[in-house]
């Protein structure tokens, strides 16, 4: 069991005890708990994209921000005009991102590694949607502009995608062990983590389940790797200077997140 699985297991234990003590957690409390964790750990994990990208690529700061904001603007326009297809694209991109981050602990030096990332990511996303389809369909009814997404959650393709990606993930792990990209011990550690994620998505409401994964596995892993990378390229990096680097873009992200939420609730 790696450290992220251990932290994740502890978080599951804590949530179980909360349910045991108070019974069902109402929706507002779920949102409060989840949003607090995401604000503290989830959003900051992407706040160093500029530093990380500029340290690995020969591009000016202006060019980076111009391209970064241009992509965001194009996606915003696409969301306004084609929300259904834009949401599907968002799920696919998220799947790849989660897969790439998940395997950052291993040195996968082969051409098909992107296939590994997308397969694992699709397994994660399809598990989340497949195991919580009924809850997702109900949640989409809260807002007029999200009702159209209910057809995604009720579509049989989610079930097919879940079972296909589960099978491919098992085959993929066996392949990685066979090619010695990961050890047998790593494989069992991955299977155990998959099991924890699956159980979390199955037992808990989707907001709680996804937040536990997003914060305690994905964000913590990303923050750890970002810290270790910066320690290699900057001599004076410590915990407190690392936190200071996270603050500027985190504040900007909080501001735009607030604007989006405000617009959604007042639509």
Per-region residue spans from a language model:
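Hydrophobic, membrane-inserted alpha-helices
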Residues: 12-18, 67-76, 98, 191-200
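Alpha-helical transmembrane segments and their membrane-interface exit regions
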Residues: 37-46, 91-104, 216-226
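Alpha-helical transmembrane segments of multi-pass integral membrane proteins
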Residues: 115-136, 158-176, 192-206, 252
């Amino acid at each position: 069991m790696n450290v992220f699985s251990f932290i994740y297991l502890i978080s599951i234990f804590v949530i179980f005890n909360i349910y045991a003590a108070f019974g069902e957690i109402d929706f507002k409390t779920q949102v409060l708990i989840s949003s607090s964790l995401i604000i503290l750990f989830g959003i900051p994990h992407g706040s160093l994209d500029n530093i990380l990208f500029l340290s690995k690529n020969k591009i000016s700061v202006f060019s980076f921000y111009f391209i970064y904001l241009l992509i965001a603007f194009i996606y915003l326009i696409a969301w306004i005009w084609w929300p259904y297809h834009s949401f599907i694209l968002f799920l696919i991109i998220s799947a790849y991102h989660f897969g790439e981050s998940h395997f950052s602990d291993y040195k996968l030096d082969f051409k098909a590694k992107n296939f590994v990332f997308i397969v694992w990511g699709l397994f994660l996303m399809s598990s989340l949607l497949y195991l919580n389809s009924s809850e997702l369909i109900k949640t989409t009814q809260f807002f007029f502009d999200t009702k159209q997404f209910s057809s995604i959650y009720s579509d049989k393709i989610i079930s097919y995608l879940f079972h296909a990606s589960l099978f491919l993930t098992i085959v993929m792990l066996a392949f990685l062990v066979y090619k010695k990209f990961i050890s047998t011990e790593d494989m069992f550690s991955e299977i155990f983590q998959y099991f924890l994620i699956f159980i979390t998505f199955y037992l808990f409401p989707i907001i709680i389940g996804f937040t536990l994964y997003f914060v305690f596995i994905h964000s913590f892993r990303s923050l750890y790797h970002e810290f270790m990378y910066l320690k290699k390229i900057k001599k004076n990096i410590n915990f407190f200077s690392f936190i200071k680097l996270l603050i500027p873009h985190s504040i900007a992200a909080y501001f735009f997140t607030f604007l989006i939420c405000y617009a959604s609730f007042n639509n």
